[in-house]
Curated annotation (Swiss-Prot):
Highest taxon of source: Eukaryota
Disulfide bonds: 225-228
Protein name (Swiss-Prot/TrEMBL): Beta-glucosidase 26
Family statement: Belongs to the glycosyl hydrolase 1 family.
A GO molecular-function annotation: beta-mannosidase activity
Residues annotated as glycosylated: 87, 127, 233, 424
Enzyme Commission no: 3.2.1.21
Spans traversing the lipid bilayer: none
UniProt-listed PANTHER family: BETA-GLUCOSIDASE 44 (PTHR10353:SF28), GLYCOSYL HYDROLASE (PTHR10353)
Alphabetical list of InterPro entries matching this protein: Glyco_hydro_1, Glycoside_hydrolase_SF
Origin species: Oryza sativa subsp. japonica
Annotated binding of a beta-D-glucoside, by residue: 59, 160, 205-206, 345, 416, 463, 470-471, 479
């Protein structure tokens, strides 16, 4: 028996050594979590429900200084040393510009239906307006054509943080009313050029982040705020930028509906980020704080789009610092979506912070809330790599249900959802992402509950297919379900990718 045990130990040690030397792609069978769909399957969702992945041009394309692309505000923003960890850039990132076929093939192999990508404005119009860059047009035609060939439905987003630098230098971009016509012209060109194949459009991704992170705290390009080196005014500029973003969205939708929608037979919407804000307690003050947070976060954009006006709470607090819509603008903005994308990752507790600051200092200060991440010593959820990302599955149910009940149950797509690992994990560590599998399984289960209760959600997009350039975090954060070796750019599907493959190929509930 002792000889048998010794031989068994030796065999197990040899097997373990072999597995450690194998490419990660050969080791997926080791993780039983891949095969636990938790009762989820395609048939568990309404007929026609779409599963896809999402990404943005700046984060995945590369070729930032090639192919005729003009610089964006992000190219200028990250030039300052220390802005991005290790002074990283998106000049190459994961090079989807050249590797798009490989990436689309991965999507197809994993069973996904669609890819939500973004078009780089400055790759089409290097100066924001005027001369078209045909190389850029050709690239997007190749990408779209290959998706269609492989049966991957293209969901095109027109703007994901990357304003052409020329427009910022000319008139400060989103702070000028001139931007509205410029964006509408760019959108018009895209509808005309790609709309014969693209039937699902979004105007903006997370315009709240554009306004708040770009003009309130300067954390994102163009880095403006009160006290920022780039200048700015945190009490007014976020609201002005948001106002022009909303008008630009509505102007683009107007062009689409008047000129293209009837014969192209597509639909158009907007992508809004939404953290769920849970009252810290049942007190009226904490409940009011949570509602203010929802108004200042989601309502800032969805109230005008649904009702043609800003939330009453914002009008009361911001007062004359809040821009106003003319009657004509209000009519143009109201009902300017066929569907709405909700990007959801996490949830926070909200509590009343006490006396109001009577002197406005910033958009964030106008919320007048206190953030909390634990209650009675219990964290709201486990923390992912990003400091802001707590894993709170029930929050997605509450967020979607809130949109259903507050805004008349519009047609929704859960357009981003995911979690990150540290950027420095090895390939072997990175591909075995059990925590991410559990994140997706639990969040999608909660989403399904909201759908079963009547929420009109017609699709779900995981963020993201690939590890990529994660804005201010650079390459220190990995959101992908496919690991990318940034030295070789080789792709390694993670366990979570194979979990999706198993779940999406399931014919019935487990």
């Amino acid at each position: 028996m002792r000889k048998f045990i010794a031989a068994l130990r030796l065999a197990l040690a040899a097997a373990a050594h072999l597995l450690l030397t194998l490419p990660p792609a050969q080791c997926y069978w080791l993780n039983p979590e891949i095969y636990d769909a938790g009762g989820l399957s395609r048939r568990a969702f309404p007929e026609g429900f779409v599963f896809g992945t999402a990404a943005s041009a700046y984060q995945v394309e590369g070729m930032a200084k090639q192919g005729g692309r003009g610089p964006s505000i992000w190219d200028a923003f990250i030039e300052k040393p220390g802005t991005i960890p290790n002074n990283a850039t998106a000049d190459v990132t994961v090079d989807e510009y050249h590797r798009y076929k490989e990436d689309v093939n991965i999507m197809k192999n994993m069973g996904f239906d669609a890819y939500r990508f973004s078009i780089s404005w400055s790759r089409i119009f290097p100066n924001g307006t005027g001369m078209v860059n045909q190389e850029g047009v050709d690239y997007y035609n190749r990408l779209i054509d290959y998706m269609v060939k492989k049966g991957i439905k293209p969901y095109a987003n027109l703007y994901h943080y990357d304003l052409p630098l020329a427009l910022h230098e000319q008139y400060l971009g989103w702070l000028s009313p001139n931007i509205v016509e410029a964006f509408a012209d760019y959108a018009d060109f895209c509808f005309q050029t790609f709309g014969d194949r693209v039937k699902d459009w979004f105007t903006f991704n997370e315009p709240r982040c554009v306004a708040a992170l770009g003009y309130d705290n300067g954390f994102h390009a163009p880095g403006r705020c009160s006290g920022c080196d780039a200048g700015g005014n945190s009490t007014t500029e976020p609201y002005l930028a948001a106002h022009h973003l909303i008008l630009s969205h509505a102007a683009a939708v107007k062009r689409y509906r008047e000129k293209y929608q009837l014969y192209q037979k597509g639909r158009i919407g907007i992508l809004l980020d939404f953290v769920w804000y849970e009252p810290f307690s049942d007190s009226n003050a904490d409940r009011a704080a949570a509602q203010r947070a929802r108004d200042f976060h989601l309502g800032w954009f969805l109230d005008p789009i649904i009702h043609g006006r800003y939330p009453y709470s914002m009008l009361e607090i911001v007062k004359d610092r809040m821009p106003t819509f003319s009657d004509e603008e209000s009519r143009m903005v109201k009902d300017s979506i066929d569907y709405v994308g909700i990007n959801h990752y996490t949830s926070f507790y909200m509590k009343d912070p006490g006396p109001w600051n009577l002197t406005p200092t910033s958009y964030q200060d106008d919320w007048h809330v206190g953030f909390a991440y634990e209650r009675n010593g219990v964290p709201i959820g486990a923390q992912a790599n990003s400091y802001w990302l707590y894993i709170v599955p029930w929050g997605i149910n509450k967020a979607v249900t809130y949109v259903k009940e507050t805004y008349g149950n519009p047609t929704m797509i859960l357009s981003e959802n995911g979690m990150d690992q540290p950027g420095n994990v090895s390939i072997t560590q990175g591909v075995h992402d059990t925590v991410r599998i559990r994140y997706y399984r639990n969040y999608i289960t909660e989403l399904k509950k909201a759908i079963d209760d009547g929420a009109k959600v017609i699709g779900y997009f995981a963020w993201s297919l690939l590890d990529n350039f994660e804005w201010r975090l650079g390459y220190t954060s990995r959101f992908g379900i496919v690991y990318v070796d940034y030295k070789t750019l080789k792709r390694y599907p993670k366990d979570s990718a194979f979990w999706f493959k198993n779940m999406l190929s399931s014919k019935k509930r487990n």
